[in-house]
Amino acid sequence: MTAAEAEAAALIERRGNVEVITINRPAARNAVNGAVSIAVGDALERANGDPDVWAVVITGAGDKSFCAGADLKAISRRENLYHPDHGEWGFAGYVHHFIDKPTIAAVNGTALGGGTEIALASDLVVAAESASFGLPEVKRGLVAAAGGVFRIVDHLPRKVAVELLFTGDPISAADAARWGLINQVVPDGTALDAAIALAGRVTANAPLAVQVSKRVAYGVDHGVITDEEPRWDRLFTEVKSLMRSEDAKEGPLAFAQKRRPVWKGR
């Protein structure tokens, strides 16, 4: 991967004290590959160290998809989807990459799987009316391993959250707002503008006070949310075991072959 490829995978724009990061793979429904993780992760890190950036907005290019999750073609090529120098930042260089600056997801379309996990990792979420959210990994014999499997339970009533986890079914933006998963639902085509407007309300305040509020609210120590670390450890242990199962191989294979999976429970 060249530096130019990594740079093109996400567009960076400054709007006053707000940095806008746009995942720039509309032809692939903004699916995450290694280039996206590098571009997004590096942009976040620069924003965190820049005293003139007071908030960050993340969105997807185009008007169909915010992020379709992991790039299955990249996975089939055995491409590393994570930042090569900062694997600890997690999926998209984002989901385990805490920054002091407030983050806002402008969900301009479908946000299934990893797209929902990016939204869950954001402080605030603005979504277009046609947006949808969900964690469909169980339909492929997998699990929402970018933090979604435990964060969804923090964001929704438990019964609602586990229904989404167990069925893999999506919910609309309206339902996501009703349950408190997102902050605002706005007309299609206006999610980014609405997110920037929300960022403006945040950046109207004293930036250091906002950053302290964020760190204390999340219980951050040495750049990580301390209460989440045992859950990440448990998730990684469970995923390693799951990936050795026949079902974990059958799900992606059936998807690639466009047929119903045949589960064996082993």
Predicted regions and their residues:
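Well-ordered beta-strand positions
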Residues: 124, 163, 167-169, 175, ...
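C-terminal long alpha-helix characteristic of the crotonase
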Residues: 26, 126-131, 182-230, 246, ...
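Short, active-site-adjacent cap segments at secondary-structure transitions
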Residues: 63-67, 112, 217
